[in-house]
């Protein structure tokens, strides 16, 4: 037995919290997770402040606990110690993404000639991982798709991913998806009120739309995406999660759809297109009901850009579209690159009173 700090979280959130913590190397795998009534107590590999957990979207108690030692296989870094130099080990990324049975690394160029060995080491250390990918190109283009190469494993890049009681089928090489928005998705779903109409303008394979529909049976969600591969997975995921009566999928550009099929229908608009969401503010205005509503706007900000200044720019853009706004909340969601962050703004938008 060993006494250390752990996170106490309700069981229904345990799977999601574990995924977030493991992706950042924060779980002490040498100790067993404890189960106590309706809670899990997860041993931490290092001290973490409550504020840091909140930034990751984890609301939980920090507790000192007596944990039982686990018999386990060597972890990723232990497998690499006999293969890589101490200098190489220092630049191995400590965080990675797990999407279903796929692990996604982003290795620095300095490790390029050893990438296969690194991939094999990771595959050996994770019993539920089928294939290890290295991200070779950033998200780009109209479809927001990155470039990947297989480091280890086999079986292709299509997988099933589970989150907040929902299941999603996707091919990570053909569609945009990140598990790092898990906390943001359930946060938005918890804000949706009974009977609301939600327009998800950049829905991808449907995580925001489907989680909202599963958690709120009386809502109506219109989900659209311009990527035909994402659209096909969206259709399939709607069926897999049995929300056909609540979610309707559209294939097409948000600007065109908001001026036609989705015009004046939404109480709440989701705009998860942080690289260029601001050029679609007119689409949000068009999709909102005539008396206005709420917009969840996602943007990328460099570290030296003030979020209040960014909101003022957004406010001015809406003003030019004939709208007045009120900032309800804003938050830094995640780091996407050194000194570059993904931010979310919850904005009330109404027609201007002249």
Summary of predicted features, one role per range:
Residues 1-354:
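SAM-dependent transferase fold signal centered on methyltransferase-like domains
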């Amino acid at each position: 037995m060993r006494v250390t700090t752990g996170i106490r979280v309700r069981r229904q959130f345990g799977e999601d919290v574990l995924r977030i913590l493991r992706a950042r190397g924060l779980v002490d795998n040498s100790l067993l997770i404890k189960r106590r009534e309706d809670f899990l107590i997860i041993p931490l590999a290092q001290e973490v402040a409550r504020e840091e957990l909140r930034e990751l979207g984890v609301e939980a108690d920090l507790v000192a606990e007596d944990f039982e030692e686990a018999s386990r296989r060597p972890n990723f870094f232990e497998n690499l110690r006999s293969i890589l130099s101490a200098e190489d080990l220092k630049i191995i990324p400590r965080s990675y993404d797990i999407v279903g049975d796929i692990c996604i690394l982003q290795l620095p160029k300095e490790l390029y000639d050893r990438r296969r060995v690194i991939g094999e080491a990771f595959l050996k250390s994770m019993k539920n991982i089928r294939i290890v990918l290295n991200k070779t190109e950033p998200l780009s283009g109209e479809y927001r798709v990155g470039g990947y190469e297989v480091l280890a494993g086999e079986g292709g890049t299509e997988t099933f991913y589970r989150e907040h009681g929902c299941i999603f089928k996707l091919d990570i090489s053909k569609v945009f998806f990140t598990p790092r928005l898990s906390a943001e998705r359930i946060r938005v779903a918890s804000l949706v009120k009974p009977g609301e109409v939600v327009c998800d303008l950049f829905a991808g394979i449907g995580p925001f739309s489907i989680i909202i529909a599963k958690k709120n049976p009386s809502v109506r969600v219109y989900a659209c995406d311009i990527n035909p591969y994402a659209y096909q997975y969206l259709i399939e995921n709607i069926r897999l999660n049995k929300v056909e009566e609540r979610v309707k999928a559209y294939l097409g550009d948000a600007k065109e759809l908001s001026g036609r099929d989705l015009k004046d229908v939404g109480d709440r608009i989701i705009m998860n297109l942080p690289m260029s969401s601001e050029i679609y503010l007119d689409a949000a205005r068009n999709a909102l009901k005539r008396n206005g509503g709420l917009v969840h706007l996602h943007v990328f900000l460099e570290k030296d850009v003030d979020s209040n200044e960014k909101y003022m720019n957004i406010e001015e853009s809406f003003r030019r579209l004939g709208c007045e706004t009120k900032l309800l909340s804003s938050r830094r969601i995640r780091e996407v690159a050194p000194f570059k962050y993904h931010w979310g703004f919850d904005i009330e938008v109404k027609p201007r009173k002249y």
